[in-house]
Amino acid sequence: MAKETFYITTPIYYPSGNLHIGHAYSTVAGDVIARYKRMQGYDVRYLTGTDEHGQKIQEKAQKAGKTEIEYLDEMIAGIKQLWAKLEISNDDFIRTTEERHKHVVEQVFERLLKQGDIYLGEYEGWYSVPDETYYTESQLVDPQYENGKIIGGKSPDSGHEVELVKEESYFFNISKYTDRLLEFYDQNPDFIQPPSRKNEMINNFIKPGLADLAVSRTSFNWGVHVPSNPKHVVYVWIDALVNYISALGYLSDDESLFNKYWPADIHLMAKEIVRFHSIIWPILLMALDLPLPKKVFAHGWILMKDGKMSKSKGNVVDPNILIDRYGLDATRYYLMRELPFGSDGVFTPEAFVERTNFDLANDLGNLVNRTISMVNKYFDGELPAYQGPLHELDEEMEAMALETVKSYTESMESLQFSVALSTVWKFISRTNKYIDETTPWVLAKDDSQKDMLGNVMAHLVENIRYAAVLLRPFLTHAPKEIFEQLNINNPQFMEFSSLEQYGVLNESIMVTGQPKPIFPRLDSEAEIAYIKESMQPPATKEEKEEIPSKPQIDIKDFDKVEIKAATIIDAEHVKKSDKLLKIQVDLDSEQRQIVSGIAKFYTPDDIIGKKVAVVTNLKPAKLMGQKSEGMILSAEKDGVLTLVSLPSAIPNGAVIK
């Protein structure tokens, strides 16, 4: 029997700059849905990609001295690298510069032109280049006036400046579909989510009257050209929106994917582009006589305490930095737990560190560690088989486990990720309390309570298994580590379907003898400071580095310092010191002993054989009773010392100038 299909898409991202945490938010959310649906047994297709045409890309490429495709290839490589780092499980990545996409855009445009839904006219309006969007005078924010006439303003979506544009343009006659669109909304009340977005679309855009949409430009060349009138480039919102069907092979020689997966189950996007997905896209599909997607979900923005993320404000969060320092699971967990999906949320370094320490390290990590340690201590690592509830606390835990799955499922189906995770953490917290209530350390002292003790352990492991399965869509590493440490190898016990009945571990298993912390605790103060520093714009960092920390010297002063190349031939720790190493270096004409404060960063074995730079004309000194005849140069950053290593080709004794 064929699996039920599920097709989910993210917005396709505009690669005019590096992506930030907000872009990762959309894509991680899509990944969570895709993993959840796969876990439920669906045949899932998850699409993401890039929107690569338009005036801004053309200008960026020219400024960089590259062709558009050269510029784009570099940007897309970075985006794909970030998605790989986030372990996004997309099934396809569509680029609007690909032939499979351009071919569909051309055919769609010509078809709409032929059937009269697109017509040629002249457009005059206010245009934002970064947003690639036209606005009417009434939509502008902070309009500027001269002699009572508007001469400028800003985009209501982004705040970017707009410019008055007048040019020949093709128009899409969307106004004639107004009644049909409203009828579709009535028949499909859950089409636009959250409901507040639907009210916004109707009251702000549809009721005032839909104006026909300009769908081509002649002022730039980078895009899909209209086949029957090549001086026109297809406007981005026709070009970009079609990606959802071009990626499935619509109008190609092989439409099997399109026939299998269309219509989409969910289009995910940030709230600023919901208008295009809930008004223009449905009308375009109506004009093509194609089924409409089942749901459009517009999530909120990730804001900072001082408003939207902006490089000039120094508040942009790079997901790469969070992943590299704190791990992927901590990053994904924070995004899905701290920020209510559908509403705006505020990113703070304090909340990120707290979620990692309290939720992941304390609640989940300690539960796993305590449980495995007790199984090892009381049963030599062999977990007794589940026997059923032997105590009213057992019955309570089993009932809560099944209720947790039910509540979790309801939240996941409505894309309330933070609520779903909160439900899991209530269960984890209750399981930690179950340990205190059953007092295994007391039961272990009474041989007659051996069965009761074993059943407590079985309930703890089963509860942890439940939590690990429910966390699989969110965390890509921790559930695997939990299953490994519990020695749960049967894939069946890792599936969502295994949660329908409590107590499937009806045979004894050997847990790991050495539980490993899954989430190390963070130094709150240090890590909050680190995240804040990483958010500063590059210019600020450069300015800090340019501030001289010591008085300037002239060349005569510098000439007094003698620096030579040397090879470290031996090293050992200085007794009674955790900072110092006693090092022997070969300077060709002589050997010297140098005492260096690098023991916290290097072992003796790490440095033997290294070619280093040595200041050879320092006055000899004694450190911890050891004579030191020089200084090995090292670099220091954020309290970390790194030896200055020289190429091996430089001979010992060579003077460095």
From Swiss-Prot:
SUPFAM superfamilies: Anticodon-binding domain of a subclass of class I aminoacyl-tRNA synthetases, Nucleic acid-binding proteins, Nucleotidylyl transferase
Compartments where found: Cytoplasm
Subcellular location, principal: cytoplasm
Any one GO molecular function term: tRNA binding
Reaction(s) this enzyme catalyzes, per UniProt: tRNA(Met) + L-methionine + ATP = L-methionyl-tRNA(Met) + AMP + diphosphate
Role this protein plays: Is required not only for elongation of protein synthesis but also for the initiation of all mRNA translation through initiator tRNA(fMet) aminoacylation.
The protein's name: Methionine--tRNA ligase
The gene coding this protein: metG
